[in-house]
Every structure is written in C-alpha cells, then in structure tokens.
Amino acid sequence: MEQGVIEELIHLQLPEMEVANVVNVRDGNGNGNDIDGGNEVWAQHQLDNVNNRQMAILLDAPPEPPIVLHQLPQPVNVPQRLRKKRCFWTITKHFHAQPERCALLSNAWQAVQYVQPAQRSEHFANYMYKHMNSRNYPNGEGLPNRWGHF
C-alpha cells in the first residue's frame, strides 16, 4: 500500500497586534526621563534604526541559521596519539619461577610442613644441624656456595 505525499497550503489567519517600540534615550542629567537636555542626535539615530526596515529585519533575524545535520562535515579518522611508554621499573609482573634453592633447604622445607606451626622454627634448626654434615654432602657438594643460594 503506497502512500502519496499530499501538498496543501495551509493559511492561518493571525490576529493583528500592535507593537510598541521601546527606545532607550540618554538624558544629559542622568535621570533617563527626557531627551531635552540629552544627546538629541543619538536619540534620533536610535529612532531611525527602529523605523528603518532593513535594520528591523536584521534585529528580528535569529542569531544563527539552524544547523542541518546532514550537511555537517563527517569527522576524519585521525590515528590516536601513542601513549607514553611506562618506565621499566614501574612495570611489575608476577614471577612464577621458583627461586633457586639448594637440596638441603628444599628437603628441610618439606620436612617442616608436617610439623605444628608453633614448633616449625625449632624443627627446622634441628633438621639443618642433623643433616648438614660431610656424610650427606661429601666435599660440600649440594650445599649453598654463595649468598642467596638458599
């Protein structure tokens, strides 16, 4: 079902209204009441502007033409500016690799896991004293050879 466009002219009869022109006229006395003592040339210029048809059209005109959306220029795709790269020292990543440990410390840690938490420090010291000997580690092989090896 097609619908056609109907073009009709609609005439509205508007009631006639009287318009009062208000003109600000300077007074030489500072009262603003009369133009006798004021600047009569300036007052006449104001009246001429109101009675001038071209000036009246300019004063009645809207400040800007209406914006037609389909005539606006399309935004241009501009590549975004690269962000500042962060400093190496501020980037932190979780370290998943196990720290380097000697076999003695790994064995002591496993043995301590089965002891009550209150007695772990004493058990750890006893384990290290008992197992750190030349029979378990001949010629010191397997023992930590530098700081941080634990």
UniProtKB/Swiss-Prot annotation:
GO BP annotations of the record are: sperm individualization
**Keywords recorded for this protein, A-Z:** Developmental protein, Differentiation, Spermatogenesis
Per the record's keyword annotation, is Zinc-finger included, yes or no?
A: no
User: Where, if anywhere, are coiled coils annotated?
Assistant: none
**Which family does the entry's similarity section mention?**
Belongs to the male-specific scotti family.
* Functional summary from the UniProt entry: Post-meiotically transcribed gene that has a role in late spermiogenesis; required for actin cone progression during spermatid individualization.
Q: What is this protein called?
A: Male-specific protein scotti
The protein's organism comes out as Drosophila grimshawi (Hawaiian fruit fly)
Species classification: Eukaryota, Metazoa, Ecdysozoa, Arthropoda, Hexapoda
